[in-house]
């Protein structure tokens, strides 16, 4: 794992993603030429399939490589996989001819990904991140850079950012952990930390008092989609490994869960205001240095105004009046049941689940105390957190500033969308929406409130064809045994 795509300069746009490709095109121990097999063919001879068990991805802030389904009973294969990790870390060949060959591969990837929605998202960045490094940072990069960068540029980028202090290794499987750690130290002993390394900068995202609004259309987009963000300060890494952080995450989970239940209820009405809607909380679009409470909706072509107003109304209703005790009881019970299930199934946890947790710990400092501790904590914590705590948090999520709206839809003659001014006016009206508290109409009563009295068998008939017996009861029910 490596932290860095956002660190590209304008003349390097796309090099982090390009470098990810090059990691499979020849390394010190897997040259992929007449002297030896490359990583992909070697792995596939061992049952490690490219794309399924051997892969990588590059996002704005990190590149993650993955090797899975390694036969741990074959120590030679395990040792060779450690060499692959070593080579990715510091020994990718970056040969001229391989770089030129990969330019064509990435051009084709760029063409295949260049959908209407991606074009809109790329164009929206400048509005969503004004005067920010994030304003132009899609991992695929600039096709002009991909076509023309000098060979030395990617070698310099590799040397600058692929280094031990920015790298992490996660290994999970049927192994001896101490022996594996010793092997890693031996394999990686020649990977040296650079002298005077470049600073790894984490770029902030500024607050905004007035809404940031982007409206984008494209002929390839089929239906409108609405994304509304309420930006929040990101939780400092230093506060994540605390009981307070767990409590906040639990309360946040409850708020999102209950709001989504309300939105889902609206979607199931006879004439729903949207085709789909949801609420969430996480990183603000592409940036890790800012978080956001988000509302999303998909609508019919002529239903943008109604969909947008409805999700804002439901967020405002939750902010103003909160959630009911019965809603919270259900959400809490479902959450605790899910935790209990995870705890009971803990011995069946797949390696990939552990890997995901450890990767999140390395990249985002998410705590990893284990399901035993988390289950114990939830049992102690959840019953003692009242719905009022959730309602107080909801008031903080829906803010009057730091609002961002991304509206995307099809480009069709005669199709009209709300203007930026109209959207801004709607946002300002939120606090004065004419709303009533939510009524929880879900009954906790049993389906049948009266005791059911037993009936009598009034007739009995044998079925010689199937060898069964048909019974008719006094309440007219037919039973076949």
For every predicted segment, state its role.
Residues 103, 119, 123-125, 136-137, ...:
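Hydrophobic, small-residue-rich alpha-helical packing segments that form membrane-like cores
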Residues 3-68, 119, 136-142, 257-291:
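M16/MPP (pitrilysin/insulinase) zinc-metallopeptidase core fold and M16-derived inactive scaffolds
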Residues 103, 117, 154-185, 401-403:
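Non-catalytic, conformational "gating/processing" segments within enzyme and secreted inhibitor domains
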Residues 176-264, 268-270, 329-333, 337-340, ...:
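Proteolytic maturation boundary segments
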Residues 35-41, 93-111, 122, 176, ...:
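Acidic/histidine-enriched alpha-helical segments
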């Amino acid at each position: 794992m490596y932290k860095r795509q956002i660190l590209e300069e304008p003349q390097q746009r796309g090099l982090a993603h390009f470098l990810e490709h090059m990691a499979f095109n020849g390394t010190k121990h897997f040259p992929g030429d007449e002297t030896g097999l490359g990583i992909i063919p070697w792995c596939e001879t061992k049952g490690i399939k490219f794309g399924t068990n051997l892969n990588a991805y590059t996002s704005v802030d990190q590149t993650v490589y993955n090797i899975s389904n390694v036969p741990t009973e074959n120590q030679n294969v395990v040792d060779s996989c450690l060499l692959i990790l070593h080579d990715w870390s510091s020994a990718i060949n970056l040969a001229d001819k391989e770089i030129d060959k990969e330019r064509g591969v990435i051009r084709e990837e760029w063409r295949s990904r260049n959908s209407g929605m991606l074009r809109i998202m790329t164009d929206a960045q400048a509005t969503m991140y004004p005067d920010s490094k994030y304003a132009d940072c899609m991992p695929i990069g600039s096709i002009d850079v991909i076509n023309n960068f000098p060979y030395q540029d990617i070698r310099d980028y590799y040397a600058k950012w692929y280094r031990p202090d920015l790298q992490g290794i996660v290994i999970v499987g049927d192994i001896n952990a101490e022996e594996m750690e010793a092997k890693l130290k031996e394999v990686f002993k020649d990977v040296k930390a650079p002298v005077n390394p470049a600073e790894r900068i984490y770029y902030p995202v500024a607050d905004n008092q007035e809404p940031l609004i982007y409206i984008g259309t494209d002929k390839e987009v089929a239906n409108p989609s609405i994304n509304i963000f309420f930006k929040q300060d990101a939780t400092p890494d230093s506060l994540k490994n605390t009981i307070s952080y767990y409590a906040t995450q639990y309360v946040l989970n409850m708020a999102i869960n209950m709001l989504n239940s309300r939105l889902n209820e609206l979607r199931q009405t006879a004439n729903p205001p949207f085709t789909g809607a949801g609420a969430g909380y996480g990183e603000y679009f592409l940036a890790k240095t800012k978080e956001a409470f988000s509302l999303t909706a998909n609508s019919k072509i002529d239903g943008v105004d109604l969909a947008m107003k409805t999700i804002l109304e439901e967020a405002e209703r939750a902010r103003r009046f909160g959630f009911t005790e019965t809603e919270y009881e259900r959400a809490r019970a479902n959450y605790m049941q899910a935790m209990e299930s995870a705890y009971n199934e803990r011995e069946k946890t797949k390696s990939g689940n552990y890997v995901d947790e450890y990767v999140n710990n390395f990249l985002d400092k998410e705590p990893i105390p284990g399901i035993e501790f988390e289950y114990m904590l939830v049992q102690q914590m959840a019953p003692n957190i009242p719905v009022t705590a959730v309602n107080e948090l909801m008031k903080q999520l829906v803010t009057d500033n730091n609002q961002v709206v991304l509206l995307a839809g099809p480009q069709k003659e005669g199709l009209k969308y709300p203007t930026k001014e109209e959207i801004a006016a709607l946002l300002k009206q939120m606090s004065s929406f004419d709303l009533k508290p939510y009524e929880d109409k879900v009954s906790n009563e049993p389906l049948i409130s009266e005791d059911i009295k037993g009936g009598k068998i009034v007739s009995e008939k044998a079925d010689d064809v199937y060898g069964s017996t048909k019974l008719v009861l006094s309440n007219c029910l037919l039973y076949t045994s």
